[in-house]
Amino acid sequence: MDTKTLIASEIAKVVPELEQDAIFNLLETPKNSDMGDLAFPAFSLAKVLRKAPQMIASELAEQIDESQFEKVVAVGPYINFFLDKVKISSQVLEQVITAGSDYAQQDEGQGRNVAIDMSSPNIAKPFSIGHLRSTVIGDSLANIFAKMGYQPVKINHLGDWGKQFGMLIVAYKKWGDEAAVQAHPIDELLKLYVRINAEAEIDPTVDEEAREWFRKLEDGDKEATELWQWFRDESLLEFNRLYDQLHVTFDSYNGEAFYNDKMDEVLALLEAKNLLVESKGAQVVTLEKYGIAPPPLIKKSDGATLHITRALAPALYRKRTYDFAKSVYVVGNEQAAHFKQLKAVLKEMGYDWSDDMTHVAFGLVTKGGAKLSTRKGNVILLEPTVAEAINRAASQIEAKNPNLADKEAVAHAVGVGAIKFYDLKTDRMNGYDFDLEAMVSFEGETGPYVQYAHARIQSILRKADFTPSATTTYSLADAESWEIIKLIQDFPRIIKRTSDNFEPSIMAKFAINLAQSFNKYYAHTRILDDNSERDNRLVLCYATATVLKEALRLLGVDAPNEM
């Protein structure tokens, strides 16, 4: 039991007027540590007990069992709890030594599946920084869900269908060079895509020609299908090379095209449930009772299916295939209205499991404050960006530690980790401005800063030639080690908060706080001095490194032992 839960349970024993969960949520951390480790404000009981908060605090402080704490005192309207540092540090250190990287493993999920729709780039378009957010947020959430006892199923719902293929076929037939595309597939396809979109803005017949080619593709035309398959194959080769660099894997690459033969069933289900309504020659589902208007188009007058219809088929397929406990869509916040419609239509169809679906939205990545756009050619391509990040990391490592073994692997871990961490430390609903120099810095709230703290601890443990013993009791009581102990003890709750809120930034900020707390401890404590506290301090180092490494792993970031 963590200390916050312990305090809430002890207060609940003497305050039957409040639920333990409510007490837990009211607990505060005093700004000054001299005022205790946690405090309960008595204001919330004033109305119920019809007494002044100061009097309530004083009376309750006397009733609470102090045996679990160093002391419990009333200060004005607050009950302040001072925790038993020796006892708690001993328990926490023992837990980490015993469990190792499994420390804070939880069983909420009980092995149930979580479907995660993530990354999902468009075929024949370059993998840009804009795709990075969905990829790394989804990958981190998969790690977090696994830590919570779920079985993540990572789905790359490729954008391998749609009118853009009509545009690309038109462009290739006008200006395409097979040899050039084979030599540099994505670069050439991007040039063609940008060029045809520019032409479409001044020539309206381009759009019609593209629609015609896409209709041919839908009808199985041989030439259209062969070009589509070629564009898809070349793009996947490129994407998989990048995923390898990012150390991201998937359980499914079923994209839009996979569901082409599943549209009729969706339409039949909607019709059987009498949900389709005629509107100006098209078919819609009315969702006014959900506050959604206008109604989503299901089928156009020409028989073409729309975005919402093409989202219903994957939702149904995933429920049948994975019987998910949760289904998560890591997609930009500009798609919020679409996901509200999707859930509402499924609800109308009688599928209450739609409540288990969550749109994990995120903000935009900008460059110099400007929105990125593939269509306009204003993109930051991921592959050269990763290469540049690795080069910058290598330069800093060379300056700090020229004799480091395996510099290339460490530079890769630091460079890639820097890009991932910078993205994940940002509250996902907020966007951020892309700044590679800030990302790869070893100073500030960055991935390399946290990785360096971990490497520093490993260096200390190597110098000391120290391995903790599971049969020895270790404990600490000084103020700076106590700050670290409290963070380590809080790790299980941080994991659950990250999972409950679908918010990896909670974990990233925890990692920063733990690294900062250790660096402060390192600056003021002679860890390797040969005295009675040496082993206790080294165990604290070991526990900190264990939790830092695991926090980084949950974010999809490697933790080198040397830097």
Curated annotation (Swiss-Prot):
Cellular component GO terms, alphabetical: cytoplasm
Protein EC: 6.1.1.19
Main location group: cytoplasm
Gene3D superfamilies in UniProt: Arginyl tRNA synthetase N-terminal domain, HUPs, Isoleucyl-tRNA Synthetase, Domain 1
Family membership: Belongs to the class-I aminoacyl-tRNA synthetase family.
Subunit annotation: Monomer.
Name this polypeptide is given: Arginine--tRNA ligase
Organism from which the protein derives: Streptococcus pyogenes serotype M49 (strain NZ131)
Gene: argS
